[in-house]
């Protein structure tokens, strides 16, 4: 039977197509709906891990799916932003973030197969938080630009800063993860 933290993780994944559909419609009401769906999905990320630790319900499924659900949610948002030509969200940003996620996921799978534990780092947590802040801020800024068009330059500048921070933390956390797993990655 699936426990509550795992149900929350699955629920987060189920919300992704709804978020994407609402966002890509592009009307004001659908952007509000997309933001609300995204906020609910992001909130489940906070609570599934908390509940799993609090009630000792940590599972292999959760260890794999929770970070994967985060990656899918964030990448879905970034791809939607690129599709809608959101300034500063381009293929280079997406490739850097996706490459890091694929490399780290690959290392994580190898580590699990070898019963090798790579401790979570503050860099990985900061990376995830920065990506969630970026994706939520972009949606808020888009809505804000419709309400107060005069602030568009401010929103653009803030988006650029958030993109730089998210990409920098993505690269740093990826390097940190590779460095911590160097013994595992020694090819024999």
Per-region residue spans from a language model:
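Alpha-helical transmembrane bundles and membrane-interface segments of multipass inner-membrane proteins
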Residues: 1-188
């Amino acid at each position: 039977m699936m426990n509550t933290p795992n149900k929350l993780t699955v629920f987060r994944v189920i919300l992704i197509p709804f978020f994407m559909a609402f966002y890509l419609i592009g009307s004001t009401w659908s952007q509000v709906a997309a933001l609300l769906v995204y906020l609910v999905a992001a909130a489940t990320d906070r609570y599934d891990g908390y509940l799993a630790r609090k009630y000792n319900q940590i599972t292999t499924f959760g260890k794999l799916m929770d970070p994967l659900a985060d990656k899918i949610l964030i990448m879905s948002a970034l791809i939607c932003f690129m599709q809608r030509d959101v300034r500063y969200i381009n293929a280079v940003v997406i490739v850097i973030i996706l490459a890091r996620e694929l490399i780290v996921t690959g290392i994580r799978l190898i580590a699990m197969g070898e019963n090798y534990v790579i401790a979570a780092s503050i860099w990985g947590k900061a990376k995830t938080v920065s990506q969630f802040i970026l994706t939520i801020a972009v949606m808020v800024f888009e809505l804000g630009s419709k309400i107060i068009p005069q602030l568009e330059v401010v929103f653009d500048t803030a988006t650029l800063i958030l993109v730089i921070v998210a990409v920098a933390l993505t690269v740093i956390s990826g390097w940190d993860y590779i460095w911590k797993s160097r013994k595992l990655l020694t090819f024999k």
